[in-house]
Design a protein with these regions (language model features):
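Active-site acidic/histidine clusters and adjacent loop/turn architecture
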Residues: 91-154
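Conserved short secondary-structure elements within globular domains
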Residues: 128-192, 196-203
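N-terminal leader/targeting and assembly helices and adjacent pre-domain segments
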Residues: 1-119, 201-264
């Protein structure tokens, strides 16, 4: 079902991408279509956030409209997660499509439509499938994190199978109080990470575990965590280039999309 969903979403983007190619000589029209593509990609990523948090769209909108009128502390934390996720993922979607545009521009002239579509597919199906899963997983972990008390002991665990990366396995069993748990170790800590956290009532592992973090080479893309109000994909991600940050059309698109989401 997940693969089918990813493919259906790609087909929506592909349709818009073909329109983009047909209007590429018309700069204004092409940018308008690019905004449609970025909006689609953003909506698909936000959908993963809602799925991971077990939240429907109406509840998400209701939370976003609230400011200080929360019924529970959980509602406030859920809203904080939604805001952090949306802020990060609008940027991410725009940066991803800009990376696609740059690859198109870097290829030889008169590239066939099939090869152009292959580039679109690489970003919006193959890469997107992995990214969608990471976003879904980050949201699920964030939702679980909300329910843990600050005093609870959190232990890092792997799936324990042959697919586990060695350096992930080296982290298994590391335990901290929630209040001290490093954001860098809240899954996902890398693309395609399947590690998870569990509560542990014992404190015996903690003293031995805490010094380890200082010597670890953590993937900088995942140095923050949605669970603690950070970004899923940090500024270290290859999409977030200086060229992207300085492209005025893209920054205007980002502002408009965020405004629409907050206004809802």
């Amino acid at each position: 079902m997940t693969q089918e969903k990813n493919h259906k979403e790609y087909l929506f983007i592909r349709e818009a991408f073909i329109r983009f190619l047909n209007e590429i000589e018309n700069s204004q029209q092409a940018w308008e279509i690019m905004e449609d593509i970025i909006t689609l990609r953003t909506s698909f990523l936000i959908d993963r956030i809602l799925d991971g948090m077990h939240m429907d769209f109406d509840k998400a909108l209701d939370l976003l409209k609230k400011h200080n009128s929360f019924t529970t502390e959980r509602e406030k934390r859920e809203r904080d997660i939604l805001i952090a996720a949306i802020d990060n993922l609008v940027d991410f979607a725009a940066a991803e499509e800009f990376a696609m545009l740059n690859e198109l521009a870097a290829t030889e002239e008169n590239l066939s439509e099939e090869r152009q579509e292959n580039i679109c597919e690489k970003y919006n199906l193959h890469y997107a499938t992995i990214e969608n899963n990471d976003v879904l997983y980050a949201a699920g972990i964030a939702s679980w994190w909300i329910d843990q008390s600050d005093e609870s002991m959190i232990t890092y665990m792997t799936q324990g199978d042959e697919r586990v990366r060695e350096w992930h396995l080296s982290l298994e069993g590391i335990t901290y109080p929630k209040r001290d748990f490093p954001s860098e170790l809240i899954p996902p800590i890398e693309f395609g990470c399947r590690c998870y956290l569990m509560t542990d009532s014992t404190i015996s592992k903690v003293i031995a575990s805490i010094p380890l973090i200082e010597d670890m080479e953590i993937n900088p893309v995942f140095s923050e965590s949605l669970a603690t109000g950070g970004r899923i994909f940090s500024e270290a991600h290859g999409y977030f280039t200086e060229k992207f940050r300085n492209e005025p059309h893209l920054q205007d698109i980002i502002i408009r999309i965020k405004h629409k989401l907050w206004k809802q």
